[in-house]
């Protein structure tokens, strides 16, 4: 599981260090690689362990092949994905299309989201978390958990 928020830099080639805690979680689970893809709700990159990606792909591939709206979502979901390995220094190379999608500049933030990880441009992340969540939404959320 992935938890916590970590500030890092991303270089001009698109390399950024995956936080040590996240690398340790991947290693403990026997996950040698991650899959990077567009996060559909905000301009961020979502990182998933290979096993989580495999589960999602199976569900997506079981989606109705005759429903155009579903297939459009499948296309966006699958086509944005990139399997990546960590280098010897624990860095991940974020592909240019994903860097552009998320607006990743020099400073980035890795956010553990339980089974997945999000990668944000630092300014975008700060804007996102600064938005106040209405208390009724918080109550609804925890009432469903």
UniProtKB/Swiss-Prot annotation:
Query: What's a single GO BP term from this record?
Result: negative regulation of DNA-templated transcription initiation
Principal subcellular localisation of the protein: cytoplasm
Q: Matching Gene3D superfamilies, A to Z?
A: Transcriptional regulator MraZ domain (3.40.1550.20)
A GO molecular function held by the record: DNA-binding transcription factor activity
Segments forming domain SpoVT-AbrB? 5-50, 81-124
Superkingdom is: Bacteria
Q: Which UniProt keywords apply?
A: Cytoplasm, DNA-binding, Repeat, Transcription, Transcription regulation
* A GO-annotated cellular component: nucleoid
Q: Which InterPro entries match?
A: MraZ, MraZ_C, MraZ_dom, MraZ_N, MraZ_sf, SpoVT-AbrB_dom, SpoVT-AbrB_sf
Where's it found, cell-wise?
Cytoplasm, Nucleoid
The UniProt entry, under Pfam families, shows: MraZ
How it assembles, according to the record, is: Forms oligomers.
What family does this chain come from, according to its entry? Belongs to the MraZ family.
User: Could you tell me what this protein is called?
Assistant: Transcriptional regulator MraZ
Origin species, per record, is Anaeromyxobacter sp. (strain Fw109-5)
**Gene name per UniProt:** mraZ
